[in-house]
């Protein structure tokens, strides 16, 4: 085995089943991660398991023929602001990236907005969905772009950072909260790469609270909440922390928040 490609959350699953011991994969030469944010904790575990492998962090949606930005994982970490995951780097040849506001104005480095992509690799649109195509593939400054639905920021070095999905940004008791920001601290204080936060319960379409999940059934919920209290404001602290043997993944191999909410609904019933 000389080449590896997967979503980062698969590494967390390998750790859970004790399949990621130091020097477990010495033959690996190239490791590519994509499809979701790459936590630095995953990088550390992978470096120990595959010490001879180069690591690449790729980003890109299906609508842009998948990967269109990349970042080599170097000895010096390049982490996103207020996050524990790696930069997605710069556009590949033939691709362009920018951060835009809701009015589709280009934003300067340091400003948070939606990540937009352009280039020859863009899809023509969605089959039999003209309205959706026009909304997601607008013309900006005379050029066709794709709006990814991802929050992003460009730093002073020109690198892009994906800060999570816009639809994972919720409003709870008047506060705007990014669930991925909680997840970052949850991974750090639990020491577990498999961690996620959901808004639950939902009443009349409005979030009423937060519940966190960690991929370890023996997790000490009280200790985790205490540690979160030391690094997060009160309105971002989950009301409960639940441990599972493993967290559900969707067809893309990403943690499935919808399935976690459905699990909570079943418990409530």
Stretch-by-stretch model annotation:
Residues 2, 7, 62-65, 133, ...:
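Ser/Thr-centric signal marking residues that sit
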Residues 7-9, 35, 215-217:
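Structural motif
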Residues 9-11, 38, 122:
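Alpha-helix capping/helix-boundary segments
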Residues 12, 23, 183:
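Acidic donor-binding helix in nucleotide-sugar-dependent glycosyltransferases
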Residues 54-57, 72-269:
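AMP-dependent adenylate-forming
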């Amino acid at each position: 085995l000389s080449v590896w490609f997967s979503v980062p959350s698969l590494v967390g699953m390998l750790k859970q089943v004790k399949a990621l011991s130091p020097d477990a994969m010495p033959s690996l030469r190239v490791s590519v991660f994509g499809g979701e944010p790459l936590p630095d904790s995953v990088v550390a575990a992978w470096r120990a398991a595959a010490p001879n492998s180069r690591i690449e962090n790729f980003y890109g949606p299906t609508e842009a023929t998948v990967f269109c930005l990349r970042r080599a994982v170097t000895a010096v970490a390049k982490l996103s602001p207020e996050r524990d995951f790696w930069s997605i780097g710069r556009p590949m040849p033939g691709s362009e990236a920018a951060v835009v506001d809701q009015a589709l104005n280009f934003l300067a480095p340091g400003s948070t907005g939606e990540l937009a992509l352009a280039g020859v690799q863009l899809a023509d649109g969605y089959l039999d969905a003209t309205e959706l195509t026009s909304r997601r593939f607008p013309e900006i400054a005379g050029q066709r772009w794709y709006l990814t639905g991802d929050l992003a920021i460009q730093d002073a070095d020109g690198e892009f950072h994906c800060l999570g999905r816009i639809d994972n940004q919720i409003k709870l008791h008047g506060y705007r909260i990014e669930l991925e920001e909680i997840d970052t601290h949850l991974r750090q204080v639990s020491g577990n790469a498999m961690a996620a936060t959901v808004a639950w319960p939902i009443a009349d379409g409005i979030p009423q609270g937060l519940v966190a999940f960690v991929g370890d059934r023996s997790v000490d919920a009280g200790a985790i909440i205490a540690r979160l209290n030391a690094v997060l404001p009160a309105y971002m602290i989950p009301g409960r922390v639940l441990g599972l043997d493993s967290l559900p993944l969707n067809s893309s191999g990403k943690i499935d928040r919808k399935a976690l909410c459905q699990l909570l609904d079943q418990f409530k019933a």
